UniProtKB/Swiss-Prot annotation:
Name of the protein in its database record: 33 kDa chaperonin
Family: Belongs to the HSP33 family.
Its biological purpose: Redox regulated molecular chaperone. Protects both thermally unfolding and oxidatively damaged proteins from irreversible aggregation. Plays an important role in the bacterial defense system toward oxidative stress.
UniProt main location, coarse: cytoplasm
Annotated keywords: Chaperone, Cytoplasm, Disulfide bond, Redox-active center, Zinc
Species lineage: Bacteria, Bacillati, Bacillota, Clostridia, Eubacteriales
S-S pairs: 237-239, 270-273
Molecular function GO terms recorded: protein folding chaperone; unfolded protein binding
Keyword Cytoplasm found: yes
GO cellular component terms given for this protein: cytoplasm
Pfam families named among the record's database cross-references: HSP33
Biological process terms in GO annotation: protein refolding
Matches recorded under SUPFAM superfamilies: Hsp33 domain, HSP33 redox switch-like
């Protein structure tokens, strides 16, 4: 099944719903970074959340960055998504390992630890919007839910899942986000809470070949659900030699000259796809000349 996101509404527009399958995306991240199963689950949940959150982006060049920083052994998680749901991400410690938690599941909360979540929305304006919340669990889904409630004042329910098999290969990944819009009553809140608690984990449903549409149907069929859109999502890094050149130039002339004198060149490494770019002395001298011309 291809990766995609479904958008829906229910109960006369008072419920906004998103559901996604992201299995291929998470498999690609696992392959690109050589992730341990625990790191795969942690990054996969975060990428799935970001993919669904990208559906709110209207501007073509807009991006959302999720930064999770904790005191656990994974160190941190960074995910970036654009308005086309092209997702890229990495964890600081890709080989993190912990014993299973008391429920027999990967201990994402233990790997993340105590810390914070930043949601940075760059909409092409003068300054990006930055939402900052403390982590409430480190399990990712609960932290996304808390972010929406605290920073955007939108009551939200979030479910995120990554399922691996005995050989530590990703079997399924995906999630859903349900949000209450103005006009939703207490009965609607109770209905959603009961529905969510009554269905299996989202990764289990996807492994059973349930589609995102099927999952939303299970949750909202009694509330006149309407599918309003479907769009692809994928793991894609947009790094390039030109982008790396711009990054090097931000270091300034003195630091670039130091690279030339000490190493006779420089290697730039993309954290999102692990691609490496080599810049020779001649390349760096050319960048220095560009910097000098910009100052004159």
């Amino acid at each position: 099944m291809e990766d995609y996101i479904v958008r829906a509404t229910a109960k006369e527009g008072t419920i906004r719903a998103l559901a996604a399958i992201t299995t291929n995306m998470v498999k690609e991240a696992q392959k690109v970074h050589g992730l341990s199963p625990l790191a795969t689950v942690a990054l996969g949940r975060t990428m799935t959340a970001a993919a669904m959150m990208s559906t709110t982006l209207k501007e073509e060049n807009a991006v959302i960055t999720l930064q999770i920083k904790g005191d656990g052994p994974i160190g941190g998680i960074v995910v970036v998504v654009d308005s086309s749901a092209n997702v890229k991400g990495y964890v600081h410690n890709p080989l993190v390992y912990l014993p299973l938690n008391s429920q027999g599941k990967y201990d994402v909360a233990g790997a993340v630890g105590n810390g914070y979540l930043n949601v940075i929305k760059d909409l092409g304006l003068r300054e990006p919007y930055v939402g900052h919340v403390d982590l409430v669990s480190g399990e990712i889904a609960e932290d996304i839910t808390y972010y929406y409630a605290y920073s955007e004042q939108v009551p939200t329910a979030t479910a995120l899942g990554v399922l691996t098999n005995a050989t530590e290969i990703v079997v399924s990944a995906g999630g859903f986000i349900l949000q209450l819009m103005p006009g939703a009553d207490d009965d609607t809140i109770s209905f959603i809470e009961n529905k969510i608690s009554s269905i299996p984990p989202v990764s289990t449903l996807l492994a059973q070949n349930k589609s995102p549409e099927d999952i939303l149907e299970m949750l909202l069929s009694e509330k006149d659900m309407k599918i309003i859109g479907k769009s692809p999502c994928r793991y894609l890094c947009n790094c390039s030699r030109e982008r790396m050149e711009r990054n090097i130039m931000t270091l300034g002339k003195e630091e670039i000259m130091g690279m030339i004198n000490e190493n006779h060149g420089a290697e730039a490494h993309c954290h999102f796809c692990n691609k490496k770019y080599w810049f020779s002395e001649e390349d760096l001298l050319r960048l220095v000349k560009i910097i000098e011309s910009q100052k004159s």
